[in-house]
């Protein structure tokens, strides 16, 4: 953890008082489960807290930044900013992926590079930072890491895959597109949804995500990739 502490201090001017909070934020459930006798805490509860403070800070920012945007437009942009893929990218940008503790099986299966794990890690770090330093320190960190990307319009350029799929298919004729939840797993604060996209009665593709909306976007993205190969 010394290297992680040095990274945070040198890159972001962050120094944790409670080192246990920081260690917990970087401990995946798979690692804790493999070391049950040591009674190690994992980062799911911190992830829950981090998700909440992230939503609040980004919502406040968008409300102030875009006074003429509708609630729907702001919600869509916020969803893009805080989606799993985006948060995983921020974890990589901060080099957090190098420091997460994973179980052996998760490590071997490529968990260190998985968006789901890295997105959760970013939220867990925010939760730990909130408890250790307060919301203003979380806001300062996000102003360093996330907000510059928002200011550059990065997230406004992200594709709405459902709309792209609908436009592509309807250009070929009048079709009915439907999204159905196949499975719902995980605890209440860390759900994982699997969704299928159907065209009429034909199963086109599947996708996963931490919400139904994200899973639908992933399914539409996979469907577009599949159709491009035809």
Swiss-Prot record:
Superkingdom of the source species: Bacteria
Principal localisation: cytoplasm
Coiled coil segments of this chain: none
GO molecular function: double-stranded RNA binding; metal ion binding; ribonuclease III activity; rRNA binding
RNase III domain span: 5-134
SMART domains in the record: DSRM, RIBOc
Boundaries of every DRBM domain copy: 160-229
A GO CC term attached to the entry: cytoplasm
Active site annotation, chain numbering: 51, 123
Keywords: Cytoplasm, Endonuclease, Hydrolase, Magnesium, Metal-binding, mRNA processing, Nuclease, RNA-binding, rRNA processing, rRNA-binding, tRNA processing
GO biological process, one term: mRNA processing
UniProt-listed Enzyme Commission number(s): 3.1.26.3
Catalytic activity: Endonucleolytic cleavage to 5'-phosphomonoester
Compartments where located: Cytoplasm
Gene3D superfamilies: 3.30.160.20, Ribonuclease III domain
Cofactor dependency: Mg(2+)
Job description of the protein: Digests double-stranded RNA. Involved in the processing of primary rRNA transcript to yield the immediate precursors to the large and small rRNAs (23S and 16S). Processes some mRNAs, and tRNAs when they are encoded in the rRNA operon. Processes pre-crRNA and tracrRNA of type II CRISPR loci if present in the organism.
Family: Belongs to the ribonuclease III family.
Assembly, per entry: Homodimer.
Protein name, entry field: Ribonuclease 3
Source organism per UniProt: Streptococcus equi subsp. equi (strain 4047)
Upper lineage: Bacteria, Bacillati, Bacillota, Bacilli, Lactobacillales
Gene name tied to this protein: rnc
């Amino acid at each position: 953890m010394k290297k992680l502490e040095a990274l945070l201090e040198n890159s972001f001017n962050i120094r944790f008082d409670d080192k246990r909070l920081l260690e917990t934020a970087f401990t995946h459930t798979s690692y804790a489960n493999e070391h049950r006798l040591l009674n190690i805490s994992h980062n799911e509860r911190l992830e829950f807290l981090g998700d909440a403070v992230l939503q609040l800070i980004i919502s406040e920012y968008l409300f102030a930044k875009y006074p003429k945007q509708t609630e729907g437009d702001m919600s869509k942009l916020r969803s893009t900013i805080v989606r799993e893929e985006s948060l995983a990218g921020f974890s990589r940008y901060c080099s957090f992926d190098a420091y997460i503790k994973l179980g052996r099986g998760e490590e071997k299966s490529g968990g260190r590079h998985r968006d789901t794990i890295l997105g959760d890690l970013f939220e867990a770090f925010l939760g730990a930072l909130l408890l250790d330093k307060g919301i203003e320190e979380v806001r300062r960190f996000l102003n360093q890491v996330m907000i510059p990307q928002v200011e550059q319009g990065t997230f406004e350029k992200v594709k709405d895959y459902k709309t792209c799929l609908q436009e592509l298919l309807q250009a070929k004729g009048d079709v009915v597109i439907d999204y159905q939840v196949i499975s719902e797993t995980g605890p209440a604060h860390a759900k994982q949804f699997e969704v299928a996209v159907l065209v009429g009665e034909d199963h086109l593709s599947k996708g996963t995500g931490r919400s139904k909306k994200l899973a639908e976007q992933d399914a539409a993205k996979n469907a577009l990739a599949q159709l491009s190969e035809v």
